[in-house]
Amino acid sequence: MSIEGRKAREIARLGVSRTFQNVEVFGRMTVLENVMVGRHIQSRAGIISTGLRLMGMRREERQIRESAMQHLAFVGLENRATELAGNLPLGEQKLLEVARALATDPKILLLDEPAGGLNTRETEGLAALIHRILEQGITVVLVEHDMNLVMDISDEIMVMNFGEKIAEGKPKQIKNDPLVIEAYLGEEVDYSDL
């Protein structure tokens, strides 16, 4: 199945969701509303029922709100639900994006540079979150340059350099691949502590 040329809403309904390298939150909406936007993709309510505030729509809206709060709790932002998303620090905005992506109930979650701009503590928290996502049975596809994070969370790794695949395999194979070492690591690195 190809998703090329499909609209974002259609892709999400197919079970594919993503976050962006550059944070894309709705800054003037609350943290909760940002996640609810992601959940609305799975909504059955149409424009007319939403506009008329019909009973079924109100029930669905309540379910969407509850689901959004569960996703905020999953990423550790439940206490920030009423704050404006634009007021969150970068690390929390990235977590918010993950919560919004998870609200679509994806089978596949694409994370584009999720550790970009994060400090060590935030990156460790992100790794723990990704492990919890994987435990939920969601496939995570990661585009990332933080090799410690990649080695920590990955079962399989494909390495590209200037658009060309240079290696593919298990983390242990990748960390010892001479092309990967030359392109990204600069020297052999001991990841055995991870």
Please describe what each predicted stretch is:
Residues 1-194:
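Glycine-rich phosphate-binding loops of nucleotide-dependent enzymes
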